């Protein structure tokens, strides 16, 4: 620029524009990844709807539940069949709500039947009005159920809230009630899991952070978003140079399964952060990629984990395709190798209620019908 006077006059303006742009970016409404904006496939009518199941009773009691590892030693790796049954029985209404919400939202996004939407919103509104899952009387298993349920519900709800079909446009009152409940529950989840000592920060904290991330987008709360990012950083900074998580290695024969279980919430948080201008991929020298690669290598050769912690690995959980749903967000964050892509395609579609339903439809819609048996 030749005119020094003009340059001087423009300088503050350019600075102001830069500040404004930064502020605008910070103030931009939080959003989910692009796949969550998908419209409803078809709006069907007629009597082929599956109807609305009986609503599970809103759970308002103390969140005091028996652990399925009750009686196990510090490793928490040996299943107690009796206490697992007691846990399943006492939490049945909660998991029915989680599974039912994910299922109905998937059905509605496919078929667009108003009764599917009404059923989902009626369930969530009733639980919200009952102030369910908000008890301050809880044990570790109880606060774990709270954050799992919140993550399931909020991530399913996001598909309704952001769909280009705008299904909530005629349901603003219910939406406000539901979002206020999610918001309040997320505050409690933050309180439940914040600032734990590192030796107690494990996959539970990552799942708590995922529930708060999903809620931050559902309710447009930047403070919740920031907390989820903070917890993500704590989590991936626990990944060592070889891609192991020391606290999950303690799980003895279930160490590999728990490394795999740590990946879905971390990959989802990174994916949601990415579309909101926060790139977490390189945190701790690409720790998320390192962890994912270590797990995939461990699935091929479990001896890697046995050599590390001295225990032969229990592969039961890892025979279920849906346990690898984290590959959907992971392979959008990083470039997955052709053999990993082939593995992913062989397992699709990935449907898991704890992440809000059908992740293949969100992240890789061209493969939503799956390739099993082809």
UniProtKB/Swiss-Prot annotation:
Domain of life: Bacteria
Localization annotation: Periplasm
GO biological processes: alginic acid catabolic process
Keywords of this entry: Lyase, Periplasm, Signal
Any one GO cellular component localisation term in the record: periplasmic space
Keyword Lyase: yes
Catalytic function, reaction form: Eliminative cleavage of alginate to give oligosaccharides with 4-deoxy-alpha-L-erythro-hex-4-enuronosyl groups at their non-reducing ends and beta-D-mannuronate at their reducing end
Disulfide-bond pairs as recorded: none
Signal sequence coordinates: 1-26
Protein residues bound to substrate: 67-68, 140-141, 258
InterPro entries, per the entry: Alginate_lyase, Alginate_lyase_dom, Chondroitin_lyas
GO molecular function: poly(beta-D-mannuronate) lyase activity
EC number: 4.2.2.3
Enzyme class: lyase
Function: Catalyzes the depolymerization of alginate by cleaving the beta-1,4 glycosidic bond between two adjacent sugar residues via a beta-elimination mechanism. May serve to degrade mislocalized alginate that is trapped in the periplasmic space.
Xref: NCBIfam families: PRK00325.1-2, PRK00325.1-3
UniProt similarity note: Belongs to the polysaccharide lyase 5 family.
This protein's name: Alginate lyase
Organism: Pseudomonas fluorescens (strain Pf0-1)
Upper classification of the organism: Bacteria, Pseudomonadati, Pseudomonadota, Gammaproteobacteria, Pseudomonadales
């Amino acid at each position: 620029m030749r005119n020094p006077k003009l340059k001087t006059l423009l300088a503050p303006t350019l600075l102001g524009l830069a500040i404004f742009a930064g502020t605008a970016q910070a103030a931009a409404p939080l959003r989910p990844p692009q796949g969550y904006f998908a419209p409803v496939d078809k709006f069907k009518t007629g009597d082929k709807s599956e109807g609305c199941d009986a609503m599970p009773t809103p759970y308002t009691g103390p969140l005091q539940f028996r652990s399925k590892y009750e009686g196990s030693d510090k490793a928490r790796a040996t299943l107690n069949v009796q206490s697992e049954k007691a846990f399943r029985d006492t939490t049945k209404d909660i998991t029915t709500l989680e599974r039912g919400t994910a299922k109905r939202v998937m059905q509605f996004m496919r078929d667009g039947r108003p009764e599917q939407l009404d059923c989902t919103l009626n369930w969530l509104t009733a639980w919200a009005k009952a102030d369910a899952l908000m008890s301050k009387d809880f044990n570790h298993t109880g606060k774990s159920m709270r954050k799992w349920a919140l993550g399931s519900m909020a991530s399913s709800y996001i598909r309704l809230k952001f769909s280009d079909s705008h299904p909530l446009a005629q349901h603003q009152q219910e939406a406000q009630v539901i979002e206020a409940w999610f918001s309040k529950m997320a505050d409690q989840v933050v309180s439940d899991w914040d600032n734990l000592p590192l030796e107690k920060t494990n996959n539970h904290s990552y799942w708590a952070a995922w529930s708060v991330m999903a809620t931050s987008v559902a309710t447009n709360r930047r403070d919740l978003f920031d907390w989820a990012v903070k917890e993500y950083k704590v989590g991936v900074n626990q990944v060592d140079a070889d891609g192991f998580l020391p606290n999950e290695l303690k799980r003895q024969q279930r160490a590999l399964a728990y490394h795999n279980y740590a990946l879905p919430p971390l990959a989802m948080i990174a994916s949601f952060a990415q579309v909101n201008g926060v790139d977490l991929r390189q945190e701790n020298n690409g720790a998320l990629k390192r962890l994912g690669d270590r797990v995939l290598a461990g699935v091929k050769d479990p001896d890697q984990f046995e050599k590390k912690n001295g225990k032969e690995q229990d592969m039961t959980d890892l025979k279920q395709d849906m346990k690898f749903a984290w590959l959907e967000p992971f392979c959008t964050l990083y470039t997955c190798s052709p053999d990993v892509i082939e593995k992913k395609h062989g397992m699709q579609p990935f449907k898991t209620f704890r992440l809000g339903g059908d992740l293949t439809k969100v992240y890789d819609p061209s493969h939503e019908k799956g390739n099993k048996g082809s």
